[in-house]
Amino acid sequence: MLFAFGDSYADTGNTKIAVTRSWHFPYGITFPGKPSGRFSDGFVSTDFVAGYLGMKTPIPYRWRKELSGRVKYGLNFAYGGTGVFDTLVAEPNMTTQIDFLQQLINDSVYTKRVLRTSVALVSLAGNDYSYYLETNGSAAAFPGFIQSVVNQLMVNMKRIHDLGVRKIGVMSLIPLGCTPQNTAGSSFQRCNETENDLVMLHNNLLLQAVNTLNQQTNSTLFFIIDLHNAFSTVFNGTEIHQGSPTFENPFEPCCFGVTEGFFCGSVDENGGKKYTLCSNPKTKLFWDGNHPTSEGWRAIYSTPAFQNTLKQFID
């Protein structure tokens, strides 16, 4: 059984239609052929992790009553745009997402016996940091804020474990300075290395936090899914496996707003498209300004960095 917590890198349809582009064309054009609430043209990380574990993708929490027969495979509590703290998105932060699981346990939807065989995927893709910058957080205080984010993430992971979930894998931050949102200013040619340095601080603190959790529980039940090195492998064009995709400029997205202020899926008051769309998403690592294509996720999933850390779910 798989539970997912976090943000748009894991969300498979929780975020409300009114507040997100992921329910609008052209999202979902590769799979399932229409918008599904995933922030991609197709699959996202949760789908690949579930496949690796030989499980069905857990349904979104908001559909638990309509698809009650699928609840036995786990649930996805992730909401796009959220963080460990509140962000600009009025959706449940990670603490509230864990509250949802707590309530289901209280209601006997999941028993302690069942939870002992379950695992959790935790995604933190950086929305807390975007919110900090957009609300004029100071550069000098940024490292301290990163520490507070990691501290809260550590609290959240410990709580998931205390509820009975057996193993918890948390994804490291990707090189955020290399996302199309941050490379657009250089015509998708150069990464923002200042931002990447802050990412490394987060990832180093996260490693320390996971080590501390394992020491406290005298176990190896907490681990990092190495999304950072997986992305770096793909960015650098390193051979992944025979038949693995080769992407055109990895910093350039398939779908992007025509000018600043517009995004993938944006339309004007007459319904006219205000974005450009590539002819074949399989040739692009990124779908939009921040999220990989389905083929991008497949490439990331196929890297040794990702595969080797996923093994800890079943070891």
Residue ranges and their predicted role:
Residues 30-40, 85-89, 191-197, 283-294:
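Active-site rim elements
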Residues 19, 175-193, 208, 212-215, ...:
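Mobile gating loops/cap/lid regions near enzyme active sites that modulate substrate access
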Residues 25-151, 155:
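Conserved SGNH/GDSL esterase-like catalytic core that processes O-acyl groups on lipids
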